[in-house]
Amino acid sequence: MKLLLTTLLLLFNLTLFAQSNGFAGDYSRNFSKEGDHFIEYKLTLRQDGTFVFHSYSKIKNGIPPEVNKYGKGKWTAKDNVITFLSNKQEDFDAKYTLDFNNSKARFVTKNPRDKSARIIKTKLTFVESEIFWVQRLDIFKI
């Protein structure tokens, strides 16, 4: 009886972990104007609950003309809201300087019950962030 119960419990746990939530993956967004500027945001949400963010901007006549900014930390999901957390001791160094603590993003995708032909790209929309230029940023899944 114990063996049967243990086997059922193990199978139940394996099926829980086998179902992916669809949040993890690579997200990207580009803004550009021919010859004047180029801005790119990249976000990678890993299955293990960590993330890496990279912002690159190349602005003509900008000071400095090229800027790279990085951030990393952990993420959690509840319903369709992803919360980003950064640990000051582990996630910050000379390269990773962006503080994503208390940042939240909404996961937006087409509802499976929506049978219309309209196309809705899967994206994250940042709804809260202490980084002012991240607030209200849409970043699309690749």
Over which residues does each language-model region extend?
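Short, conserved beta-turn/loop elements at beta-strand boundaries and strand-helix junctions
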Residues: 78-82
